[in-house]
């Protein structure tokens, strides 16, 4: 089992009130379905399994993101919800095909 990352945040490990604000992914999914999400949620994968970091299978991480996104989008609160997916790592997987060159900038100005 992964070490919950909230335990590395100063003051959380010693505070039962703060620890109570952290829930499992299962609870998050249930809260989303019931329209009980708080004003702000920060969702993390199990880093030893569900992340997209090397050497994990990135498809598992993609499924995790899809499951979270689907739950939020099907929530009764979706109409007034913003969903941001961010990364703190760039991956580490090599793409054997170089990206295409950038488009040539236009010399005309558009108004």
Question: PLM ranges: what are they?
Answer:
Residues 1-111:
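N-terminal pro-sequences and low-complexity stem/linker regions of secreted or lumenal proteins
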């Amino acid at each position: 089992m992964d070490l919950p990352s909230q335990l590395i945040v100063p003051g959380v490990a010693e505070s039962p009130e703060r620890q109570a604000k952290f829930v499992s992914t299962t609870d998050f999914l249930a809260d989303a379905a019931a329209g009980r999400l708080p004003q702000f949620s920060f969702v993390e994968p199990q880093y030893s399994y569900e992340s997209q970091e090397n050497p994990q299978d990135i498809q598992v991480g993609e499924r995790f993101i899809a499951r979270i996104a689907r739950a939020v989008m099907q929530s009764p609160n979706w109409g007034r919800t913003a969903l941001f997916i961010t990364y703190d790592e760039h991956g580490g997987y090599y793409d054997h095909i170089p990206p295409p060159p950038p488009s040539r900038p236009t010399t005309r100005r558009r108004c």
